[in-house]
Amino acid sequence: MANGTLPPDSRYSRLDHGSLIPVEQINFPNIPGVTGPEGIFNTRFLYYRGPKYDTDDLSGVIAVEPPIPLLEYPSLVPQIDADGNDIDGLRSHILRAPLGTYTGWNVRAAGFSQGDACDLTGSYIPFAVTKAERLANGDPRLSLQERYTNTAGYTAAVTAAVNRLVSERLMLASDAAGAISNATAWFTQASGGMLQ
C-alpha cells in the first residue's frame, strides 16, 4: 500500500473462473511445425514411505522403498485463447496486442531428450505476416495483417492496451510512451517492415 491506496486485485488463473483447467483439457492451436504441450507435464504423487515417515515435513525414517503411490496430484494449467496465450493472469500490453503465441514452456528439439520439456525456457511463436502466408502454412492463428492491417493499426491496438493497463493501475503512466514505442518497434521487426 502506498499513500493509502491499495494495490489492484491479484490476477491469476482460477478453477472457479474456468481459467485453471486439468492439463488434458488444454486445446493448444495446431500450429504447423510446433509441438504442443500435451504430454510434457510432470505427474506428481503423494507417496506412502512407511509409518515413521512424515510426508508433511519430509522427515523421519523411510521404511517402504520403493514408496507406494497413494494419490496423484491434479495437474492444472492456465486456460488459453485461440492463439495459445494464457487468458488470465496479468496480461501485459504484449499479450493484449500480441505478435505471436507466448508460452511459459518449450519442447526440446532434435538431439538430447527430443520432445521433452525444456525447463525454465518459454517460447515465442510469431504470427504469419500476411493472410497469404498464414494460409500457405496452414496456421489457424490470424496473421499480423489480418489483426492490425499495418503499423498504424498495431500502434492503435497497443496504445489502447497500454491505456487500459494504466487505467487498471497495472502500468505507470510514466512507462506508457516507452511501452508503446518499444512494442511498435517490435511490430516493425516482426512484420519485416512489410506492413507500413
Where would I find each of the regions flagged by the language model?
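C-terminal His-loop and adjacent cap/lid subdomain of alpha/beta-hydrolase
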Residues: M1-Q196
